[in-house]
Design a protein with these regions (language model features):
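N-terminal alpha-helical interaction blocks
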Residues: 1-89
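His-enriched metal-coordination microenvironments in redox/metal-binding proteins
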Residues: 1-9, 114-118, 142
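Ampiphathic alpha-helical segments that act as solvent-exposed interaction surfaces
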Residues: 20-37, 86, 95-104, 108, ...
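A composition-biased, non-transmembrane "mature-region" signal
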Residues: 31-37, 117, 122, 162, ...
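A structural detector for beta-sheet-dominated domains
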Residues: 70, 99-101, 151
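Cys/His-rich short segments
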Residues: 81-140
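Long, charge-rich boundary regions
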Residues: 131-183
Length: 183
């Protein structure tokens, strides 16, 4: 499933795929207080400009990342933050997601796209049926009900600082991770 409309994103999400904030506004306030998220984007109450401390929380790889933090060209191709909360566990896999590795036998499941049903996968190697999020997706797919999407970030172009993930865990009592979504 593709819940995102952006081509490439860094996505931060809770390790428990069933977790959602009791109050979504608390998540927004936490991100704004930390300076990761800034002002709301126009009428959308789930999208934000990056905050004043965005670059303190996200580390860019390489010596010269080419990111736009403002919509200078009015084309919508710039880095902003979007929060997505769903009622059911959502699988976010792009066409660039690699074969995940089985949590039991550790072998790759090459036919995962055909086998993924109701967020379950059965390994063709060992025949073990598992929740899909237990497979090792190598940070190229994720499952959950709550996602913090940082748009216009390509795979391995940037990563969240551990201090940001620790702050989210301290605020909400659940550990957080990240993955890259690339349509």
């Amino acid at each position: 499933m593709n819940a995102f409309t952006n081509n490439a994103s860094l996505v931060i999400y809770p390790s428990n795929p069933n977790w959602t904030p009791d109050n979504p506004e608390a998540l927004i306030n936490t991100l704004q207080k930390a300076g990761l998220a800034g002002e709301f984007l126009k009428k959308d109450k789930n999208s934000f400009l990056v905050g004043e401390k965005f670059l303190d929380h996200i580390s860019f790889m390489g010596c010269s990342p080419n990111i736009k933090l403002e919509n200078e060209d009015n084309d919508g191709k710039f880095t902003f933050i979007q929060i997505t909360i769903t009622e059911t566990i959502t699988a976010l896999t792009g066409k660039h997601s690699f074969s995940p590795h089985c949590p039991h036998c550790k072998k790759p499941e090459k036919n995962w796209r055909e086998l993924l049903q109701d967020n379950q996968l059965t390994c063709n190697q060992c025949q073990t049926k598992s929740d899909a999020w237990l497979f090792n997706w190598r940070k190229l797919a994720g499952f959950g009900k709550c996602f913090i999407e940082i748009t216009d970030i390509y795979p391995k172009e940037a990563i969240p600082q551990p201090s940001l993930l620790d702050s989210l865990e301290k605020s909400f009592g659940v550990s957080w991770g990240y993955f890259f979504y690339h349509a």
